[in-house]
Amino acid sequence: MSQSHTQEGGDDVLSIEELKLKFHTYAGEVSALDGIRLSIKKGELFGLVGESGCGKSVTALAIAGLLPPNAEITSGDVFLDGKNVLKLKPEEMRLARLKDIAMIFQDPMTYLNPVLTIGSQMAEITRAQPELFVSTLVNHRLRQIDRPVDGTVPDPGLLAERENLAHALKSQGLGRKELNQLTKSYAISLLKSVRLPEPEKVYEMYPFELSGGMRQRVMIAMAMMRRPKLLLADEITTALDVTVQAQILHLLKDLRSEINSSVLLITHDLAIVAEVCDRVAVMYAGNIVEIAEVDELFRNPLHPYTKGLLASVPRADLARTPDSIEGSVPDLISPPSGCRFHPRCPKAFETCPSRKPSMIEVGPNHYVSCFLYGG
């Protein structure tokens, strides 16, 4: 008997239910997402892995409400902390992106304004909707006053400032000067927390003056500024060298705990998933074919596509050339019938082209969409 792998309840910050999406193009309609289902728990670092063009980034854009004009969601729901974001009005979605959802993209230079300093761009976040950030900014400064960095007792000379801030917090009101001062203090502390050297200097710099790794750290700091419920990280280490890549990944993992956010990490690299994720979903041609805890997936992959992906990863302990998956990724304008992987699957049989397999639970927190396991 088939079983949904999403779990209703208070532990899920994100729940996607039977999401179908297509793109209208001159060549025809592209069936980009074919009824995907997944859930992410509060505080979880969840990996979404698959080949290029399988629908990973489209999933993130649908969650964030950033789809291009030629995209159409034909069915399904996306719940963020119990609220269906697909039903939100444009202004409500903008506020959700400002406070509840943050997204980090592959190329930070594309999304950073080249003519504004880093500090100006970070300040824009709070200026867009200052009432959303008063509590965060004031509480940050109060913590600085009460717990000095050098470990000394609080400066008695700051007591008046503390009283004024406490009043501002109670009344939810800050003047422009106070807002700018608190924003700068908070932004610099975030730049420091993402381990940027000389954060005060970086605050005054322009994006072109920073390296690729430094720009990506700035993007993470800007995302943290919102203290989002859900952080979407789309191929954020692809353009970075291996050393910087490892630093960014461990930074993301540490900060996830610090700001108590859930993270959807999108990647084509299984090694990244193994390094930092708690659970992972494997995606193929607009379908999720397997979901499991990371250790379980690497120890006991079940779907033929998952097995093929793992077999194609180069390994230092094997002298032979890694295996490749036969065939090519299907054209999603006219995708294969039934299971979309069946034309490339070494285990395919007569049922596979006739209908789409259901996602079933085959073990604790391990789900697979394949007729080999009764789907």
What are these regions (language model features)?
Residues G9-V13, K22-G35, L66-E72, K89-E92, ...:
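A short, flexible loop at the N-terminus of ABC-type nucleotide-binding domains that lies
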Residues D11-D12, I291-G375:
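Short catalytic/signature loops enriched in Gly
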Residues V49-G50:
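The feature captures the beta-strand-to-loop junction immediately N-terminal to the Walker
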Residues I73-N84, V138-N139, I188:
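Conserved ABC transporter NBD signature motif
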Residues V85-A102, S120, A128, N180, ...:
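ABC ATPase NBD coupling module
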Residues G119, P228-R320:
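P-loop NTP-binding/switch modules centered on Walker-like glycine-rich loops
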Residues Y206-L210:
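Conserved ABC ATPase signature
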